[in-house]
A protein has these predicted regions:
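Extended substrate/RNA-proximal surfaces in nucleic-acid metabolism proteins
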Residues: 3, 17, 58-189
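Cys/His-rich short segments
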Residues: 250-318
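Divalent metal-coordination and catalytic microenvironments
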Residues: 9, 51, 86, 110, ...
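Active-site metal-binding loops of divalent metal-dependent hydrolases
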Residues: 10, 52, 92, 162, ...
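Helix-hairpin-helix
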Residues: 320-342, 354-364
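An N-terminally biased module of ancient metal coordination in phosphate/nucleic-acid-related enzymes
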Residues: 1-103, 368, 372, 376-378, ...
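Acidic/histidine-rich catalytic cores of soluble enzymes
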Residues: 191-200, 206-208, 224-225
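Short acidic/histidine-rich active-site segments
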Residues: 211-227
């Protein structure tokens, strides 16, 4: 077995012929470009593309498989240039009963082994979604109902960015996932933490103790791929092996979660848009404004059922790592210079010594990169849709 890097949440902005898929994502973010970016610049071995249920994207996948650069695996997934395994996924917004009798919405990332499976899923979901061609459209079914449809087409379901204020289970639907999935709760074996939380925070909720945590980028542009990712131990790169790693089966497992310090996330703390301030509070804000975004940290403080975090013994480490583009002094030209010399971001973040980096970009920037990848940079909390800020290490 060997170690690989996986980012299981990447969007598509446009189809190959320019049809809109994810309106808020970059036009350059199409199926082929994602595969190329992961192979040539990021060094990501497994990527989950979560807009593959769009008929426009299905057409692109069929063309992609005819190029000679890619092929489907028996164990699931598409291999690109023998470097990257692409998992075919779909992000689905479900309709839930929210808190205090209000309607809630939650996002789920669903993955399928083969093109025929996601085709079947797409066709069935078109009866539950008004416009199946677009990404993450609201469905008229709940997560409880969705998981049965996903399994019908040999797929898996992972609740996405579970604490995000607007479109997540804990964020605006429920205090307990078990209340949503009921007797099907054990079919959920992994959850996605999201950019504003980490293992320390999530493990304050008892029902998550037996769930695998995944950290993904939720990328809306090519540079944002792998801003969060996972290190896995697998026998090969395929859908089947990823599922085993998520289930901790046969020696396969998640070795580490690499993610932002939650303070850098856009929704870490509560934010009042009326007075444009990030508020540190454990209780709902009452300032007279109806434009208050309740933060992930503050939500967890309200719903946690443990006074101190306690992770199970098999929980992998969560390693704070700042993406190159967030690091002070590292602009586009510097990144291009680094990639020209060292090929991929994973090489820069995991394999190179400080001396190697210093030889290319100088002492100050090299020191910042090393401090960032070791979690030694100071950060200022984000909130209300604004990212936190990275400050240079003293």
């Amino acid at each position: 077995m060997y170690e690989v890097f996986a980012d299981l949440h990447v969007h598509i902005g446009r189809s190959e012929n320019g049809k809109p898929i994810k309106i808020t994502a970059a036009r350059s973010l199409n199926f082929a470009n994602i595969a190329k970016e992961c192979a040539e610049r990021k060094g990501i071995n497994i990527v989950g593309i979560i807009d593959c249920a769009s008929p426009y994207v299905i057409e692109d996948i069929e063309k992609f498989l005819k190029t000679g650069d890619a092929y489907e695996l028996k164990d699931g997934g598409i291999i690109y240039k023998d470097k990257v395994c692409i998992l075919l996924g779909s992000e689905v917004e479900t309709s839930e009963k929210g808190r205090n009798g209000k309607c809630g919405a939650a996002h789920n990332v669903c993955f399928f082994p083969h093109l025929k499976d996601i085709k079947g899923f797409s066709q069935e979901m078109s009866t539950h979604i008004k416009n199946i061609t677009l990404s993450t459209q609201r469905s008229n079914i709940s997560g409880y109902e969705l998981i049965d449809i996903v399994e019908k087409y040999n797929g898996i379901l992972i609740p996405a960015h579970i604490f995000t204020p607007f479109k997540s289970y804990y964020g605006n639907c429920t205090d307990r996932l078990k209340d949503i999935f009921k007797e099907k709760y054990d079919k959920i074996f992994a959850v996605e933490l999201g950019l504003s939380s980490d293992t320390y925070l999530a493990d304050m909720i008892s029902e998550l103790e037996n769930k695998t945590f995944v950290t993904n980028s939720d990328a809306h542009s090519l540079p944002k791929i792998a801003r969060e990712y996972n290190k896995m131990l697998v026998n090969d790169i395929s859908f089947k092996e990823v599922v085993k790693a998520l289930k901790n089966e046969d020696g396969r497992k998640i070795l580490a979660n690499y993610g932002l310090d939650p303070k850098l996330g856009k929704y870490h703390r509560t934010h009042c848009d009326n007075c444009d301030s990030t508020i540190e509070t454990k209780e709902p804000v009452e300032c007279g404004s109806d434009k208050v975004t309740f933060g992930v940290f503050d939500r967890i403080e309200l719903i946690k059922d443990k006074e101190t975090t306690k992770s199970p013994e098999n929980r992998p480490p969560y390693i704070y790592q700042i993406p190159l583009s967030f690091i002070p002094g590292v602009g586009g030209k510097t990144i291009e210079k680094l990639l020209y010399n060292f090929e991929t971001e994973m090489n820069i973040l995991h394999k190179l010594s400080e001396d190697d980096i210093e030889a290319i970009v100088g002492e100050k920037i090299a020191k910042n990169i090393v401090n960032a990848r070791e979690g030694n940079m100071k950060v200022e909390s984000g909130g209300g849709g604004n990212y936190g800020k990275v400050k240079e290490h003293d």
